[in-house]
Amino acid sequence: MRKKLTELLVCPKCHEALDCQPELIADDGDIRTGSLRCAGCQVSYPIERGIPRFVPTGNYATSFGYQWNRFRQEQIDSLNGTRQSEERLRNETAWDSSWWNGKTVLDAGCGAGRFLEVSSRNRECDVVGVDLSSAIDAAQETVSGRSNVHLVQASIFELPFRPRSFDGVYCIGVIQHTPDPKAAGQSLADVVEDEGRIAVTIYERRWSTMLYSKYWVRPVTRRIKAEWLLNLIKTIMPVAFILSEVLFRIPVLKRIFQFILPVANYVDSKELSMRQRYQWAVLDTFDMLAPAYDNPQRYADVVEIMKERNIGEIQRLSNPGLNLVGTKISSSEVAL
């Protein structure tokens, strides 16, 4: 943990200042171990392996911790030879490359650092990655050595940051996996600076969404131990992958088969090799079936949440899912 991060942090419970008490400091000034003690409620939060930890181990995101420590490399552009994460981040934020200069940005639900690895390439931008699960340790390995990246293990519902700390916040594919998507969205909006930007991508709920086959089996699969579920998927995948290779390519009918087969196979991807598609099929099928929560949201509901938290200039981008971007209305304008 670097000193600059301490300037943003507050107690997630009472929002009072934190006193940093380092125990081991690396040669580059990185605080490897120590604690952060709240001046108000006197709670002490540990700093372990260079990461401040504001939540206990073991929570509703445990499957994601297992997932991203097991599949850390698969979706990292610099490791898989593609630009998929770079293009997705650019498309789903719609933030011009020059906008990032001099900004402080939050990656909410950073996982193994798929998008952190991209956003932190601009060394003039400080990026904070936060995740509830042990995936934060996988992210640390992904962005190792980048002094403009700061990592925090915390809950999206109790973000340990000062209000309006960030010039930009992006949260891609995370909110639907929380027990309370509305509260998660509100929490994110609260840490956006006046005239700052926010971008979210969420599973969209339509009349047919809950008929999708993964929702038929999730009541069972989400209760299976992560290791057992992954082994089950690996056992089934050789047959499921071949079957989906055929069915997902049939004109007109392929959408029906994608709807009724709970298998992730990106048959239309030009960048991924067959081997990579197979790895992603295992990863994303697990991602569909393992999470404790999967709560798609309606467009109108998400827009209402954003407006309640003074997000204006809301636009829906033409990307898969419910992808919304907006700008925080300044306090002076709200007062008027």
Where are these regions (language model features)?
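Conserved class I S-adenosyl-L-methionine
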Residues: 197-231, 235-238
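Conserved N-terminal segment of class I S-adenosyl-L-methionine
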Residues: 2-160, 293-296, 301, 313-336
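SAM-dependent methyltransferase
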Residues: 227-291
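A short glycine-rich, Lys/Arg-flanked "PGG" loop and its adjoining helix->strand segment in the class I
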Residues: 182-194
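Hydrophobic beta-strand segment of the Class I
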Residues: 169-170
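Short, glycine-/aromatic-enriched active-site segment of Class I SAM-dependent methyltransferases
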Residues: 203-220, 274-292
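Short catalytic micro-motifs in class I SAM-dependent methyltransferases
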Residues: 173-174
